[in-house]
Amino acid sequence: MEDFDLVENLQKTSPSVESDIKSAPQSLGLSLHANRSSPHLSTNGVSSFSGKTGPPVIQGTVEVLTALRQDLQNSGRTDSELWKSCERIQEEIRKLVKLQLSHASRPSCSSSSVSEQVSAETQMGFFSENSERNESVVSSPASKEPETQPASSTSYPDCHVDSSSVSSGYGTFCILDMNTHKAKEPTEPLEPGAASQGQHPASVVQAHGPAGGAAAINFFTQTPEELCASLKEDGSTFPGEFDRNFLGENKISEVYSGKANSGKSVTSWAQRLKQNQSKQAHTEDDCSGPKPGSELNWKPPADTFDLAADAARPCAFYINKPAESPSSWLSDSGTGLTYWKLEEKDMYHSLPETLEKTFAPSPAERPLSQVLTLDPGAIRMKPKEHVAGIQAHGFLHALDDRISFSPDSVLEPSLSRHSDTDSSSQASHNPSQVSGFSKYPSTTRASPVDTWKNHAFQRESRTSSTIPSRYTITSNDISVKTVDEENTVTVASVSQSQLPGTANSVPECISLASLEDPVMLSKIRQNLKEKHARHVADLRAYYESEISSLKQKLEAKDISAVEEWKKKNEILADRCGQLDSALNEATSRVRTLEKNNNLLEIEVSDLRERFNAASSASKVLQERIEEMRTSNKEKDNTITRLKCRLQDLEEAFENAYKLSDDKEARLRQENKMFQDLLGEYESLGKEHGRVKDTLNTTENKLLDAHTQISDLKRTISKLEAQVKQAEHESMLSLRNGAKVPERPSRSNSVATSDVSRRKWLIPGAEYSIFTGQPLDPRDRKLDKQLEEALVPGYHSPPEKDSSLGSSPASLLVKKKRDTPDTPPIIKALKELDEERVFKSWGTQTEKEDSSSKLVNSRQTEPSVNTGRSPEKCAQQRPKRQTSASQRSSSLPPSSRKANTPTKREIMLTPVTVAYSPKRSPKENLSPGFSHLLSKNESSPVRFDILLDDLDTVPVSTLQQTTAKKQLQFLLDDSEEKKYSEKNSDDPVNPSSCPEHSPNGLKKVSTRQAWEKSKSVSLEQCQPGSAAPQDNGFEYTAKIRTLAETERFFDELTKEKDQIEAALSRMPSPGGRITLQTRLNQEALEDRLEKINRELGSVRMTLKKFHVLRSSANL
């Protein structure tokens, strides 16, 4: 800023009035922002040094300004800017003077009105008399140099000022000392100072000390509106400090307002001294810390304000005109000092008021033109710098960079660490109490009104500083350089010899007691007068030089301005031509662009239509694409389903093809089986024919046999009648022969013969069955002879044995031949006994045969048969005989049908067959014939012989039946063919005796027929409810049929085992088998099922006849 250009100009010693006028805006900006508590100034102050020097200086200043204006008007070559600047300066001065007068007359009764006045006056750079906080009255150098004492400092907003007055010939010299007493009463309106209205307004000064610097008395050229606006803007930044700093010192405001204090008034120098001493004691106690209610707690580390350490505070001195009234105070712009009337309590009432008035006129009589300023900062300002500093924006940035010093700074004891010979009011002080703060250390305070608010606005001074600056303070012979960057204070030089009249008259340190000396006060006044005289001379010389330089510049500017204007006009004409051509080109270009724009708009419309059509077409195509996608998806799904269906059909076709192959194979197999069945059927038909032929022949033989039997029965009946007759005759003869002695021997012989005849009926019996006594050895011999007679014919065929007399009848004939001749009656009796024996033997044998057959048929294996003990057989024999006799006797023979044998009766028909290898023929032999066999022989031939011999046994007539009824025990029509085939292989001799023809059936082998035939007859066959006939033929056929059935059972069992073994060797059903294997397996399974059914029926049949073991007989 321009303030930095002023640093080097501080060496100038020829001040002028215009420089101060031009430097007013910069000073105003600096004082507004750097220190809001600017000291109160008065526009109606007068100089108390000399009534002679003040008015001429002011008059000269105003005359210079007026002469400058007239010269500028008369010259005709007036610079417009300079002329306007002068007029503006004059107008600003008038406004500020009016504003200050209006503020002086405005009352301040409350703290709110005081704040408003302070705000308005701060913008103008001064405070009115009615401010509540008048810190400018007392200024104490509370700060020290940072290098010397880095202790903390506290602010004391509650301190007020006590004034001491010294009366002299020139007026009253006031000494204000600081104490910590608070003001008890609010301030009252100040008395407005008198000012002459008809003269030019004097320059309004401001004692400015931003952070311990010297006060600068500046002119204010801004309007009140601008000042108020800037103050409001800046006052909002530190409202707390502002109000606190101005509301805390009510005592000082009372001093300035001129209000009479209700307290004690000082009337003598001794009382004033005692009062100052008592206030110093209060300072040690009350000022050791800040007020509890104080909001300002900022403590700079390098600044200390210790009132207890200072016995005598450095005081600011104010000179008041003796002629002034106590209620008025004025500021002398010419000297930079503030003059006012002390309060009544501080005034010396003993001094006559008329005496004071004799020294100087009243303030109202003093013209404003006599006000002088001693501000070297304003003196060194150049006229051109005033115009640049008028703008309001300089207030914000130049506040902390501008510190103005007045010539009154020599009064401050803090200028130097050593003695200050120019300061005639220097009290004894500590060298460490150098005025200055951490950011803006200052060494001087020219105006006492700056020092009071110095410590209260330390932080504002620091925080508002943005540009470090260097200040060179020149007050006549004193030069002080302040370097803000280093926060140091350097006193360049203090020359006591350059201050004339003070070197020998003022000591180095002026104590408070020395200030009370009138001689010292007069010397101080004299020094001040001389100093002010020099300042006035410097100001006059400075302003004259400035005016001359401005005139020269104005003339040079007027000559060069015309040529410059011509050149500028030519340049502007050329520029206008260029602009015209450019304008034409631009218009043509604009027209072409408009045409192009129109064409482009048409194209855009066409393209828009095309785009719309294309977008609609694209939408339609997208819809079609979506439809095609959906249809394609559906088709794909259909294809997949069809593929799956095709695979299923292929698998089904393969399965059907395999099934068709299997069916064809089955058909071929079934066809083959059908052909086999046809061949078997044909063979069975042929066999059936042969069986019929055989049946016819057997029927014929049966008829012949029946006729023979009937003849024999008639013969038997005749013989029985003869026997009865013979018995009757024998009885008669016995009666008659009892008288004769020979009869007893005959009866014994007959008895022995009967016993011997009967005992052989039981096989191996050595005891008689009738008496139970041992047999006679002769009877044993007879039995042996009978056995030997039977043995030679054992191995002979039945046809040949018939001639050997194997029947009982032949035996009787042989006995008759062997015995000697006996009378006929005896013979008849013997024959009768023999017939009875044979009759009983026949029935008994028949019963035993049937019972033994049933018992032996229960056993299916030889091991079981052989394990049976003879004791059990003997025990069971009587039961069997009784059951068989009852069964045979309960059947009437006439209940049979003649020609229609049933299937149930087929199994009961006796057939001659070969015996199963599992049985011995001996088991089938009735126990009644076991005596006929040797002990070591079990050949079936003898059994056959014995069976053949049974044909000649006489049968009861009740058991006889016709030949037609006998046929029901033969084979049915289905089996006739089988037996006819076997008979053809082993034919029976047709010429054989009819009594031997039934025995020919035993030669027929039916094994092949049983293998080929089905077991239909066996399945439905059940044991007959009637017992077998007593006929020998029926018994023999029955035995042969059961034997064949047993053999068939064995064969079926063997075949079943073979089929099961074959099935087990075949692969499992889960594996893959060929068609032929499957067909074979099915055929085997079918065959196995049929065999199981046949085995079941045959097994039941054998169990019924007790051939197989049953659960009932276990």
Curated annotation (Swiss-Prot):
Reported phenotype of the disruption mutant: Knockout mice show decreased body weight when compared with wild-type mice around 1 month after birth. An increased percentage of ciliated cells in the proximal and distal tubules is observed in the kidneys of knockout mice at 1 and 4 months after birth.
State where the protein is found.
Cytoplasm, Cytoskeleton, Microtubule organizing center, Centrosome, Centriole; Golgi apparatus membrane; Cytoplasm, Cytoskeleton, Microtubule organizing center, Centrosome
* Composition bias type Polar residues, residue spans: 24-51, 149-161, 267-280, 429-446, 852-868
Mark the residues carrying the PTM Phosphoserine: 710, 717, 926
Recorded GO cellular component terms are:
centriole; centrosome; Golgi membrane
For whether the record's keyword set contains Ubl conjugation, the answer is yes
Coiled-coil spans in chain: 574-733, 1040-1105
Its post-translational modification remark reads: TTBK2-mediated phosphorylation at Ser-710 and Ser-717, promotes its ubiquitination at Lys-713 leading to proteasomal degradation, loss of MPHOSPH9 facilitates the removal of the CP110-CEP97 complex from the mother centrioles, promoting the initiation of ciliogenesis. Phosphorylated in M (mitotic) phase. Ubiquitinated at Lys-713, leading to proteasomal degradation.
Residue ranges for the region (Disordered) are 1-55, 106-161, 183-207, 267-301, 410-468, 727-755, 840-931, 975-1002
Chief location category: cytoplasm
- Bias (Low complexity) ranges: 106-119, 881-898
Region feature Interaction with CEP97, mapped onto this chain: 382-431
What topology does the record note for this protein and the membrane? Peripheral membrane protein
User: How does this chain assemble?
Assistant: Interacts with CCP110, CEP97 and KIF24.
Q: What does this protein do?
A: Negatively regulates cilia formation by recruiting the CP110-CEP97 complex (a negative regulator of ciliogenesis) at the distal end of the mother centriole in ciliary cells. At the beginning of cilia formation, MPHOSPH9 undergoes TTBK2-mediated phosphorylation and degradation via the ubiquitin-proteasome system and removes itself and the CP110-CEP97 complex from the distal end of the mother centriole, which subsequently promotes cilia formation.
In terms of PANTHER family, this protein maps to: M-PHASE PHOSPHOPROTEIN 9
Q: What is this protein called?
A: M-phase phosphoprotein 9
Species this chain originates from: Mus musculus
